[in-house]
């Protein structure tokens, strides 16, 4: 089960043109924003990654503006784990639970999740904050991740799991985000 002390939120490739062409893009972007804001309220570190940003673009303003102090971690590999800067950022934070959101579910998110699972991390893919250009690609990636030992969650499920109860100091502001 997700815990605040062990979780890192990683926003994978919510960037440039890609963010606008995936299925149900506006809903996914909105959910990513809620998740990023919730992670901030809970004190959960968040990493922004961008694959080939010089070609595809950087993290979209709707998300980047929520973390103005944070720059994209650019990479060429599909998997975030295969990039030394991302790997070092994750290792420096010394946490074992990876909460993943972004695009595309069947390429960069899938390969990242598989590599993280192989390295012994617990991987939670936030289903309402991920997408692909085709929903069939997304559903296949989710099924494969689940079969390989990953976990599926939603924005609301993850945030409320992290808080544990209504006495958490972030309960009211997170409840307001969700509504």
Predicted ranges, named:
Residues 14, 48-51, 127:
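A cross-domain feature marking catalytic cores of carbohydrate-active enzymes
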Residues 4-7, 22-48:
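A short alpha/beta connector and helix-capping loop motif
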Residues 16-20:
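Short acidic, Gly/Ser-rich segments with clustered Asp/Glu that frequently serve as metal-coordination loops
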Residues 23-25, 50-51, 75-78:
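Short, flexible loop segments at the rims of nucleotide/cofactor-binding pockets, characterized by
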Residues 1-8, 41-42, 54-179:
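Active-site-adjacent betaalpha module
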């Amino acid at each position: 089960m997700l815990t605040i002390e062990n979780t890192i939120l990683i926003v994978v490739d919510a960037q440039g043109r890609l963010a606008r062409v995936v299925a149900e893009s506006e809903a996914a972007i909105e959910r990513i924003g809620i998740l990023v804001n919730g992670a901030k309220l809970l004190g959960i570190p968040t990493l922004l990654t961008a694959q080939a940003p010089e070609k595809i673009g950087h993290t979209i303003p709707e998300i980047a503006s929520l973390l103005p102090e944070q720059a994209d971690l650019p990479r060429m590999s599909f998997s975030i784990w295969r990039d030394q800067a991302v790997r070092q950022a994750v290792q420096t934070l010394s946490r074992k639970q990876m909460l993943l959101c972004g695009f595309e579910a069947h390429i960069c998110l899938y390969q990242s999740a598989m590599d993280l699972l192989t390295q012994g991390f617990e991987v939670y893919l936030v289903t309402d904050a991920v997408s692909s250009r085709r929903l069939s690609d997304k559903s296949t990636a989710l099924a494969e991740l689940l079969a390989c030992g990953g976990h599926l969650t939603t924005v609301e499920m993850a945030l409320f799991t992290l808080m544990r109860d209504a006495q958490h100091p972030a309960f009211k502001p997170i409840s307001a985000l969700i509504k």
